Amino acid sequence: MVVKFTKSEALHKEALEHIVGGVNSPSRSFKAVGGGAPVAMERGKGAYFWDVDGNKYIDYLAAYGPIITGHAHPHITKAITTAAENGVLYGTPTALEVKFAKMLKEAMPALDKVRFVNSGTEAVMTTIRVARAYTGRTKIMKFAGCYHGHSDLVLVAAGSGPSTLGTPDSAGVPQSIAQEVITVPFNNVETLKEALDKWGHEVAAILVEPIVGNFGIVEPKPGFLEKVNELVHEAGALVIYDEVITAFRFMYGGAQDLLGVTPDLTALGKVIGGGLPIGAYGGKKEIMEQVAPLGPAYQAGTMAGNPASMASGIACLEVLQQEGLYEKLDELGAMLEKGILEQAEKHNIDITLNRLKGALTVYFTTNTIEDYDAAQDTDGEMFGKFFKLMLQEGINLAPSKYEAWFLTTEHTKEDIEYTIEAVGRAFAALANNK
């Protein structure tokens, strides 16, 4: 298959004249996969994309996770259309937001109270504010490599040591803010304990991806999350789960429900919006009552709880309640995993594959991936070549070695079979060019 990107290239050239970097999120650029014009999509339906040149793709990007029910799902599309016809924004309470809040609470028992915002970044940012208000402390802990949005406090990477006060990971983030963040490696209890022994009395909360999604799919070691809860609570701090990626991705509910570990606060986004902008946060009643108008922690938003996003979210959860959907995602994920591993062995390509149900990551390495350091130490150049080869095969992946492949409820066994064949051809090409 020879895929041409003439119109995408022309559109990107034009975009560079008007949009910073030609993209509205840096993750959409092809900088991490060797450069070039990113492919511009024109429409999506089910598990498929069509770009501006008319090329068709099987989509494993799923908009970085939200599109679990596939593109333009009729039930969700109808709900959005109805909401739009009734007016997309009121600036008042609505019945839709109450219904949606109840649905989230029923699905995730740790949510005594919830509040809607407009993005995962907002949700995480506000849980931090609430935790600080509740504890009277200022420092935050996070795990290296875990992305929690682009607000100043969480755009922090680890410094030179295994546990350290943070250094800014972006220009424009003051060192004074970064020093409020303590970064430790994921899946390492001893380093976490050392950091809490040193700074625990200053820590308001720890941010946790219960299943990591931002340096690939990485599961916690057995007992790790339970130990995090124990140590953090002993220090008098709160546990915040960032479930922006994980909630409703692996089961109807949160990763916390799948794993049986309960946080104090939870941040949500992505899947719960059915493809429209959304965020939410919630948790224990006594903590959430710190939020205005009941408490002193201020948070507001003109678009928060807007009818279109509420309707889309309700419809998405209604679809996900259908029997057998998550079992299908797991079955297709297992089929894809098996096929990719077989092709890697056949063509003598070194990979490690991490999968949980309908999400997986292919790393070009022989090492086990349990933390960010291991994920960094993988072959990004090889991934970039693989990514470009897969585009030529009509397979759309995220343009980064750190990102997951996301299955949707609309993928079929035939899609998986074709994808495995495409992986085989890509691996053969890589093997011939070693």
Curated annotation (Swiss-Prot):
> Where in this protein does the record say N6-(pyridoxal phosphate)lysine is found?
270
Offer a single GO CC term for the protein.
Answer: cytoplasm
Name its cellular compartments. Cytoplasm
Q: Tell me, how does this one assemble?
A: Homodimer.
Which InterPro entries has this protein been placed in? 4pyrrol_synth_GluAld_NH2Trfase, Aminotrans_3, Aminotrans_3_PPA_site, PyrdxlP-dep_Trfase, PyrdxlP-dep_Trfase_major, PyrdxlP-dep_Trfase_small
The pathway this protein participates in, as annotated, is:
Porphyrin-containing compound metabolism; protoporphyrin-IX biosynthesis; 5-aminolevulinate from L-glutamyl-tRNA(Glu): step 2/2
Provide the cofactor list for this protein.
pyridoxal 5'-phosphate
Which portions of this protein are annotated as coiled-coil regions?
none
Query: Which residues pair up as cystines?
Result: none
Q: Which gene encodes it?
A: hemL1
Instruction: Give the family per the record.
Output: Belongs to the class-III pyridoxal-phosphate-dependent aminotransferase family. HemL subfamily.
Catalytic activity, reaction form: (S)-4-amino-5-oxopentanoate = 5-aminolevulinate
Record flagged with keyword Cytoplasm: yes
Q: What is this protein called?
A: Glutamate-1-semialdehyde 2,1-aminomutase 1
| Calcium among keywords | no
What CDD domains does the record point to?
OAT_like
Q: What domain of life? A: Bacteria
- Record GO biological process: protoporphyrinogen IX biosynthetic process
Which keywords does this Swiss-Prot/TrEMBL entry list? Answer: Cytoplasm, Isomerase, Porphyrin biosynthesis, Pyridoxal phosphate
GO MF, one example: transaminase activity
| Pfam families, per the entry | Aminotran_3
EC numbers, comma separated: 5.4.3.8
| Predominant location | cytoplasm
